[in-house]
């Protein structure tokens, strides 16, 4: 079982990276629906952040079963803090809006990957960084609902795809 957990820990960042390259800013129908739902509905953003946190808990469980150290406890505390939607929304939207903060998060994740006992922190920073890329920008979220309701579905999708960066 430990070998399986080690394989999951090793493969998980590559799966996230492949998802990023295969799905970000693509015009597939399911991605158009995803972008529209994330922009228009708060519950979709809540569900997205909850799914990210559940994946992080699973990866931290894998880290805890293979290497038990204090970094796992620190990463679990960071994840528990993000279970408040306000905190997770703030973190994801700030990482989306501030490119320097996003770059710093990715640099911290790469540094923690290089240090042997900080692998669980790598997974937290890396996953939250990748998840913030798929989060809608503050510019899109500030558009009033009435303006969205005045447009037809095709115009909404085109505008969201154009401004989803």
Describe every region a protein language model picked out.
Residues 1-10, 57-74, 90-96, 112-127:
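Membrane-helix interface and helix-disruption motif detector
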Residues 6-32:
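N-terminal signal-anchor/start-transfer transmembrane helix
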Residues 13, 97-148:
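Alpha-helical membrane-associated segments of multi-pass integral membrane proteins
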Residues 27-41, 148-157:
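Cytosolic, membrane-interface loops and tails of multi-pass inner-membrane proteins
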Residues 32-69:
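Membrane-helix boundary elements
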Residues 39-45, 94-103:
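Cytoplasmic-side transmembrane-helix entry/capping segments in multi-pass membrane proteins
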Residues 51-61, 78-85, 102-114:
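Hydrophobic, membrane-inserted alpha-helices
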Residues 140-165:
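Short, highly charged, low-complexity non-transmembrane loops/tails of multi-pass membrane proteins
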């Amino acid at each position: 079982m430990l070998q399986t957990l080690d394989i999951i820990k090793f493969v998980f960042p590559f799966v996230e990276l492949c998802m990023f390259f295969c799905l970000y800013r693509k015009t597939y129908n399911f991605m158009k629906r995803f972008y529209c739902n994330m922009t228009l509905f708060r519950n979709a953003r809540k569900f997205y952040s909850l799914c990210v946190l559940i994946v992080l808990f699973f990866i931290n469980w894998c880290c805890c079963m293979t290497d038990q150290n204090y970094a796992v406890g620190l990463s679990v505390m960071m994840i528990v803090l993000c279970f408040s939607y306000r905190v997770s929304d703030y973190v994801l939207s700030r990482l989306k809006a501030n490119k320097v903060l996003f770059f710093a998060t990715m640099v911290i994740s790469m540094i923690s990957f290089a240090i042997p006992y900080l692998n669980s922190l790598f997974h937290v920073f890396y996953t939250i960084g990748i998840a913030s890329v798929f989060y809608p920008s503050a510019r899109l979220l500030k558009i009033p609902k009435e303006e969205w309701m005045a447009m037809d579905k095709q115009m909404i999708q085109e505008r969201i795809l154009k401004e989803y960066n």
